[in-house]
Design a protein with these regions (language model features):
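Active-site metal-binding loops of divalent metal-dependent hydrolases
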Residues: 10, 134, 163, 260
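Structural alpha-helical scaffold elements that stabilize or flank donor/cofactor-binding regions
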Residues: 121-122, 182-183, 216
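Conserved phosphate-binding/catalytic region of the ribokinase-like
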Residues: 2-5, 150, 206-323
């Protein structure tokens, strides 16, 4: 039995890590992919997890398999393909740790997962299925993702969705919006970044955009909206909460911050979904998730940099003492 299974991309983040003596950019190969980042944090929170996806039968694919397995995630749903290479994402960061992406994915193994390769037995043994839109950018992997979602729905699972919009990977932003709409329409848990929310709703004013979202997707029991250094907010039933981010950390790379946050919210929902909660409890969820997300930005390579619960609580306590 798994608490959370995720389907989607597993890839190599080629993260900029300085300059050589002759002025050439140096890139560091780190394991990445939003779904597995989410699972890695859930493992730290004591959850049992499994992954469904595809990598190339190459040095990167084998490295990823070993790393994901060593993080505690079951890889019974991981498929190797000898005909296509593992996807690479080159990541440049600015002075704030924010990122620009260049993807080598034409095609990449993650987008070639077929629906007949989806391990439905793993899904049926899970409580939650988590997914994003990178596994819906192309027809082959979209069919696999839809099969996973339909299997999850038929088996009574909760669905968790993070759009994780990457415009360079879409041939049409209209199609991207359609897939975000689909993901939101089938899920009980949605974590969305503020610019993604504006893109989906067509509304720049945050409160109005949330109102539009909640009207369009009454199925979403827990909605969280992240805004980077501006903090986050959450909506659960008729309760609203917000919390600032933790700025007293030395940010190196924001890769995986949203995934870390998302994992903490999934964990909270597994404990509290369906219960009556107070605003303070919802805010505590955000504080914990914000702290975890802040800590993961202090290192490169999110999947291998997920914080321990003790470190998260220590940061929260340190912040309270400084207020």
């Amino acid at each position: 039995m798994f608490d959370v299974t995720a389907i989607g991309e597993l890839l190599i983040d080629m993260a900029q890590s300085g300059m050589s003596d002759i002025g050439s950019s140096i890139f560091e190969a780190n394991p990445g992919g939003a779904p597995c980042n989410v699972l890695a944090m859930l493992n730290k929170l004591g959850r049992s997890t499994a992954f469904i996806g595809k990598v190339g039968d190459d040095i990167f694919g084998k490295k990823l398999k070993n790393i994901v397995e060593s993080s505690g995630t079951d890889i019974g749903g991981l498929v190797f393909d000898e005909n296509v290479r593992t996807t690479l994402a080159f990541v440049e960061t600015d002075e704030y740790g924010d990122r620009n992406f260049s993807f080598y994915r034409a095609p990449g193994a993650d987008m070639m997962l077929r629906e007949d390769e989806v391990n439905v037995d793993i899904i049926k043994q899970s409580r939650v299925l988590h997914f994003g839109t990178l596994s819906m950018t192309h027809d082959v992997v979209e069919k696999a993702t839809v099969k996973a979602i339909e299997t999850a729905k038929a088996s009574g699972l909760l669905l968790s969705f993070d759009p994780n919009l990457r415009p360079p990977l879409w041939d049409s932003m209209d199609r991207a919006k359609q897939k975000i709409d689909y993901g939101c329409s089938v899920s009980e848990i949605v974590k969305i970044e503020i610019d993604e929310l504006r893109f989906l709703t067509g509304c720049n004013e945050i409160n109005k955009a949330v109102e539009i979202f909640r009207t369009c997707y009454p199925n979403v029991a827990l909605l969280t909206v992240t805004a980077g250094r501006s903090g986050s907010r959450a909506y659960y039933k008729n309760i609203y909460a917000e919390a600032p981010t933790f700025l007293n950390v030395k940010t190196i790379d924001t890769t995986g911050a949203g995934d870390t946050f998302c994992a903490c919210c999934i964990d909270w929902f597994l404990n509290n979904g369906g219960k009556e909660v107070k605003e303070a409890e919802l805010r505590n969820m955000l504080v914990f998730a914000n702290a975890a997300a802040s800590l993961v930005t202090c290192k490169k390579g999110a999947l291998l940099s997920m914080p321990e619960i003790s470190d998260i609580n220590n940061l929260i306590k340190e912040n309270e003492n400084n207020e």
